[in-house]
Amino acid sequence: HMKMILIGSGNVATQLGKNIVAQGNHQIIQVYSRNSANAQALANVVNSTATDDLTQINTEADLYIIAVSDSAIHSVIADLPKSLQGIVAHTSGATNLDVFADFINFGVIYPPQSINKSIETNLSVIPFGIEGNSTQTFEKLFSLIQAIAPKTFACTSQQRLALHLSAVIANNFSNALF
């Protein structure tokens, strides 16, 4: 049983949160968003509390899922207490694992596919890429995500970036052509 905090209230945070809660073994104890209305809206969906202040983040969680835009990851990480004992993980395809160098336990939970919070998404068909800074961290993240997405696999930062570029081309490139 893991206690988790969702950092972000957008597409990936919403679908991960809903699927983790529906799976039933884990609890989301807090949702952070810089927009308090968005934090509260997602907190209501996942039966949690909300905050719009990273200094008020619960420091007792087992996992902190950072599901924010690539442009916001660095500022969010800079504002998190570095003493967190729990795993800190982001969901970005393009952000290296070394952004967490100041933390103890860290990893990546990467869905290589566009996810929309307003469209119910069956995450079981998405092959999530998982990366961890240690075997123990990797195994915790892998077992958590594999329970909701059986096609989950291990990947390195290099593999994830290549996968991300492929996914961007497959999902978005044709839009750019027209």
Regions of interest found by a model, annotated:
Residues 15, 41, 75-76, 98-99, ...:
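Phosphate- and divalent-cation-binding pockets in alpha/beta enzyme and binding domains
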Residues 2, 26-27, 48-49, 86-87, ...:
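A structural micro-motif
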Residues 38-45, 120-162, 171-178:
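Internal alpha-helical scaffold of NAD(P)-dependent oxidoreductase catalytic cores
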Residues 36, 45-121:
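Rossmann-like NAD(P)(H) cofactor-binding subdomain of soluble oxidoreductases
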Residues 2-51:
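NAD(P)+-binding Rossmann beta1-loop-alpha1 motif at the extreme N-terminus of oxidoreductases
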Residues 21-22, 81-82, 144-147:
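Short, solvent-exposed amphipathic alpha-helical segments in soluble enzyme
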Residues 4-6, 66, 130:
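Hydrophobic Val/Ile/Leu positions in short beta-strands of Rossmann-like dinucleotide-binding domains
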Residues 11, 37-38, 71-72, 95, ...:
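Short alpha-helical
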